[in-house]
């Protein structure tokens, strides 16, 4: 029996059982590719990819020049002000971080690598309580920008050997957000949410139950944050030695990590108290007996506080910009209910307007919604849900008639599920 088979591409005959001469062979269909053809195909693909990347680089450069004129820090903040109440310092920090990211990209495109003075990335860590606007800030920022942006839940990440997602999934998410354009992906932004959930057990914070792999996850993220080549398989493909892989360099990807960091204010207070008692040989400090408020403490976060919380020093060194968000008080929640373009009250008014209904909320009702959110300790996150709970029956019944009506939501509706006041206006 002839031990050779014809290559389906070049028609050259090669030995069937030689993996070196015949790396691709399907005995069922008879399809075969010899080693020479496989090499030629890979070279052709690589040459094509080089041309594609050149075109993508030229397009990215062209877009950068246009983008630089509209993403000045003050313009980014003005845009965020339309949707996010308070958090002015955080808006400034993120606006500058994003603008500098664009400048760093432009500098890289304008100069050859051997001409470059190194401008290091200014990755950002965001701290703030649940519902204070961390995710909202970044989602609106992403809408404004013309660069890929992807969010990954850090709590789902595990180090090799544990069940869960490998850290490479963060880059893979960005790759797909960039429509599989590697050049755009390599200049995008990754947001690692719930970053506090991967704090190590040895930290002073006892409110979390960390898995043994959490410090390992942080170690796995180190090179990615600094800049390295990350290799991953396409979505839906199992990881095995023969699977084709995609390579992305993270050198120019901006990383933003964020979380509630529950309990870090206690670490900060402890540090400040230790410092205060050492001043003036134990002299009493004015207001020393008063319990510091969260908002007074969180803005004083330092790298050593994050280390005591359970973030390893090497990670902190790669997150030079600390951005803190304040807890929202009742006045801030009231403004969030009514002022931004996407304010819950404005949304429901528009929805009811489409059913020929004038929707009104009494001042007491708005205060009741804000107070309920504070009681739940969920910040702005629960505002829409509280209103939705009250509005459900009205939104179900109102479409039964086309009459022009007015619906008034009172504090009694919010607190006791009383029926809203409905008046005919015809």
Model-predicted regions and their roles:
Residues 1-35, 44-86, 91, 96-149, ...:
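AAA+ P-loop NTPase nucleotide-binding core of proteostasis motors
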């Amino acid at each position: 029996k002839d031990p050779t088979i014809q290559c389906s591409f070049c028609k050259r005959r090669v030995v069937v059982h030689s993996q070196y001469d015949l790396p691709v062979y399907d005995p069922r269909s008879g399809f075969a590719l010899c080693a020479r053809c496989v090499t030629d195909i890979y070279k052709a693909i690589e040459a094509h990819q080089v041309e594609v990347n050149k075109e993508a680089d030229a397009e990215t450069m062209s877009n950068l020049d246009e983008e630089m004129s509209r993403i000045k820090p003050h313009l980014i903040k003005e845009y965020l002000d339309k949707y996010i109440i308070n958090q002015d310092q955080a808006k400034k920090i993120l606006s500058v971080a994003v603008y500098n990211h664009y400048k760093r990209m432009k500098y890289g495109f304008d100069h050859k690598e051997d001409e470059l003075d190194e401008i290091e990335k200014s990755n950002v860590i965001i701290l703030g309580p649940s519902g204070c606007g961390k995710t909202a800030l970044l989602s609106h920022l992403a809408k404004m920008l013309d660069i890929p942006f992807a969010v990954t839940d850090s709590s789902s990440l595990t180090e090799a050997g544990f069940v869960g997602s490998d850290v490479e999934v963060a880059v893979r998410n960005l790759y797909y957000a960039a429509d599989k354009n590697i050049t755009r992906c390599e200049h995008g932004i990754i947001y690692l949410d719930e970053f506090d959930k991967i704090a190590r057990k040895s930290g002073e914070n006892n409110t979390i139950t960390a898995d043994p792999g959490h410090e390992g996850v942080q170690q796995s993220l180190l090179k990615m944050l600094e800049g390295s080549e990350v290799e991953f398989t396409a979505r839906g493909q199992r990881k095995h030695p023969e699977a084709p892989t995609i390579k992305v360099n993270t050198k120019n990807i901006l990383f933003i990590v964020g979380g509630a960091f529950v309990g870090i204010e206690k670490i900060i207070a402890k540090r400040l108290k230790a410092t205060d008692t050492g001043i003036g040989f134990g002299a009493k400090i004015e207001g020393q007996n008063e319990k510091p408020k969260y908002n007074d403490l969180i803005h004083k976060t330092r790298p050593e506080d994050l280390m005591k919380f359970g973030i390893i020093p090497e990670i902190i060194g790669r997150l030079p910009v600390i951005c803190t968000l304040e807890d929202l008080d009742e006045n801030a929640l009231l403004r969030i209910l009514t002022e931004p373009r996407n304010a819950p009250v404005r949304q429901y008014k528009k929805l009811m307007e489409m059913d020929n209904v004038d929707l009104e909320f009494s001042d007491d009702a708005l205060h009741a919604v804000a107070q309920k959110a504070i009681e739940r300790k969920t910040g702005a996150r629960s505002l829409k849900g509280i209103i939705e709970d009250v509005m459900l029956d009205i939104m179900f019944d109102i479409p039964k008639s086309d009459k022009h009506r007015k619906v008034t939501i009172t504090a009694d509706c919010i607190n006791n599920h009383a029926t809203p006041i409905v008046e005919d206006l015809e």
